[in-house]
C-alpha cells in the first residue's frame, strides 16, 4: 500500500522533482520501497543466502582455491558479511542510489556541529521528534535509516520539506512559486487518486470532479454564489459527496501550540464536512433532476434524485490523522456535520484492497455512517470500524445490544471507546501478503 500511496501523491510532482533533484518521482518511490524492504525483510533474506552459501561450502572441496573463490564470488561473501555483521541493511545511499543532495536534505547529523554548545541535541521528549522531518541519521559521513515506521508514516511531508530546502539553496524558483506549484500539483494528484479509488470500489459509477452547484436554491447562475464539490460519485441508488483535503496537518508541538492543532482539525475535517453537507443538501433540494456544472456554468451531469435512496458525506485527508478522524464527530472542539465519514487516503487504499463487491462496500459505509451518528460509541482507528464490520456486519446494532445488556446490570454508560478491533483484518492481510 505504501508504494501506491507515494506514487499517487508524487507522480504529479515529477517535473518539479526532476528540476530540483534531477531524478524522477518513480526513482524516489523505488528508493523508499527498497529501504522499507531492506529494514523489514533484509535480515531474513541475507540469512537465507548465508544458509545457502554454508550448504554449498560443505559440498565444496575446501582445499581447492579456485572453487572457494568461485563460491565467494557467487554468494558475494563481502555483501553478506556487511549486512549480517555491519550496517549494510541501513545504508541509505547504497540501497536507494539517490543523489547526495536528497540524502543530505533528509538527514540529521548524529551530533551537533562543532562549535555548538553541548554534545547532544536539546530535544523535548514529549514534543515533535526531529526524526519526523529527518528520517536518516549521518554517522561518520554516511546516512543510515533505522526506523521503518517513521520512514513510511512521515516520508511524504519530510520529502516536501527537503524539496523546499533544496529549492531555497539553489534558488530554482521563488519560495512563493515553489509552494504554489507544489500545492496545485498536490491537489490534482490527491483528488485524482481518490476519484480513481472510488472508481475501483464502485465500478461503473458516474464520477464527477470539480463540479459546481448553487449555494441557495436550485438554479445555477454565474452571478450568484456557487460552491465547488471536489468529487461526486453516483452508483445505482447512492450518491457520495467527497471532499479531499490535501493540506498538511499542523507540524507544531501540540503541547506548545494546541490552538494550531484545533485550527488544523477545523480546516481538514470540519470545513470539508460542511462542504460535503452543502452538496448533499443541494442535491436533495432538487426535484427530481439535480444538475452539476463546470466553472463556466455548463451542465456536466444530471442526477435523478427520485431514484436515490442513500447519500453519504465523506472527507478524505492526505495526512493520516486516524486517531481523531475515526471519531471526529465526538471531538468537542470541532463542529462536524452528523453522519460525516472522515478517512485518510491510507484508509481508502485499505478499503480498495479488501472490498471486492461494491454492494458490500456500500453496506459498510451505511454501518460506518450509523456508528458516527451514534452518540455513545467512539473508535480510535478507522480500521477498527472495518474490523468490527468484518466481525459483525451490523456492528452498530450489536454495540447497542451490548450497551443495553451492560446497563441493565451495572447502570448507564456515557461513552464506550473501542480499540484494537483489527485481528480479523490483520489475519486477512497476513494471508494475502
Residue ranges and their predicted role:
Residues 156, 242, 250-252, 324-325:
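Short helix/loop capping segments that flank catalytic or ligand/cofactor-binding pockets
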Residues 1-188, 192-205, 214, 218-222, ...:
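Acidic, metal-dependent phosphodiester-chemistry machinery of nucleic-acid enzymes
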Residues 206, 230, 237-241, 310-314:
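Beta-sheet entry/capping signal
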Residues 246-301:
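Catalytic cores of nucleic-acid endonucleases
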Residues 209-229, 233-236:
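Active-site metal-binding core of divalent-cation-utilizing nuclease and nuclease-like domains
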Residues 187, 191, 224-225, 235, ...:
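Active-site-proximal structural scaffolding
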Residues 194, 227-231, 242:
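Extended, hydrophobic alpha-helical segments in both membrane/secreted and soluble proteins
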Amino acid at each position: 500500500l505504501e508504494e501506491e500511496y507515494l506514487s499517487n501523491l508524487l507522480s504529479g510532482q515529477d517535473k518539479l522533482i526532476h528540476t530540483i533533484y534531477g531524478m524522477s518521482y518513480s526513482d524516489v518511490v523505488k528508493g523508499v520501497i527498497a529501504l522499507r524492504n531492506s529494514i523489514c525483510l533484509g535480515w531474513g533474506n541475507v540469512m537465507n543466502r548465508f544458509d545457502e552459501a554454508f550448504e554449498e561450502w560443505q559440498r565444496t572441496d575446501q582445499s581447492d582455491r579456485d572453487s572457494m573463490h568461485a563460491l565467494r564470488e557467487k554468494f558475494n561473501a563481502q555483501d553478506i558479511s556487511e549486512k549480517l555483521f555491519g550496517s549494510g541493511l541501513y545504508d541509505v545511499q547504497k540501497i536507494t542510489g539517490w543523489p547526495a543532495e536528497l540524502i543530505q536534505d533528509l538527514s540529521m547529523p548524529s551530533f551537533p556541529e562543532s562549535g555548538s554548545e553541548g554534545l547532544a541535541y536539546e530535544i523535548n521528549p514529549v514534543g515533535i521528534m526531529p526524526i519526523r522531518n529527518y528520517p536518516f541519521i549521518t554517522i561518520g559521513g554516511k546516512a543510515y535509516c533505522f526506523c521503518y515506521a517513521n520512514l513510511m508514516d512521515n516520508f511524504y511531508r519530510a520529502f516536501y520539506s527537503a524539496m523546499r530546502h533544496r529549492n531555497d539553496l539553489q534558488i530554482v524558483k521563488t519560495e512563493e512559486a515553489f509552494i504554489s506549484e507544489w500545492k496545485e500539483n498536490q491537489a490534482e494528484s490527491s483528488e485524482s487518486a481518490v476519484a480513481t479509488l472510488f472508481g475501483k470500489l464502485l465500478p461503473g459509477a458516474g464520477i464527477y470532479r470539480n463540479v459546481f452547484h448553487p449555494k441557495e436554491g436550485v438554479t445555477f447562475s454565474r452571478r450568484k454564489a456557487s460552491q465547488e464539490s471536489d468529487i461526486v460519485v453516483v452508483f445505482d441508488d447512492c450518491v457520495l459527496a467527497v471532499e479531499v483535503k490535501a493540506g498538511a496537518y499542523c507540524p507544531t508541538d501540540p503541547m506548545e501550540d494546541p490552538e494550531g492543532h484545533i485550527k488544523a482539525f477545523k480546516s481538514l475535517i470540519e470545513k470539508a464536512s460542511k462542504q460535503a453537507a452543502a452538496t448533499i443538501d443541494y442535491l436533495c433540494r432538487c426535484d427530481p433532476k439535480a444538475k452539476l456544472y463546470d466553472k463556466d456554468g455548463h451542465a456536466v451531469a444530471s442526477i435523478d434524485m427520485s431514484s436515490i435512496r442513500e447519500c453519504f458525506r465523506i472527507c478524505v485527508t492526505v495526512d493520516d490523522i486516524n486517531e481523531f478522524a475515526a471519531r471526529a464527530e465526538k471531538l468537542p472542539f470541532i463542529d462536524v456535520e452528523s453522519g460525516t465519514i472522515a478517512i485518510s487516503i491510507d484508509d481508502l487504499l485499505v478499503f480498495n484492497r479488501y472490498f471486492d463487491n461494491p454492494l458490500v462496500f456500500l453496506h459498510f459505509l451505511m454501518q460506518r455512517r450509523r456508528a458516527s451518528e451514534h452518540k455513545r460509541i467512539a473508535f480510535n482507528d478507522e480500521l477498527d470500524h472495518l474490523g468490527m464490520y468484518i466481525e459483525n456486519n451490523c456492528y452498530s446494532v450489536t454495540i447497542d445490544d451490548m450497551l443495553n445488556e451492560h446497563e441493565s446490570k451495572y447502570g448507564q454508560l456515557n461513552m464506550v471507546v473501542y480499540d484494537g478491533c483489527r485481528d480479523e483484518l490483520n489475519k486477512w492481510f497476513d494471508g494475502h501478503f
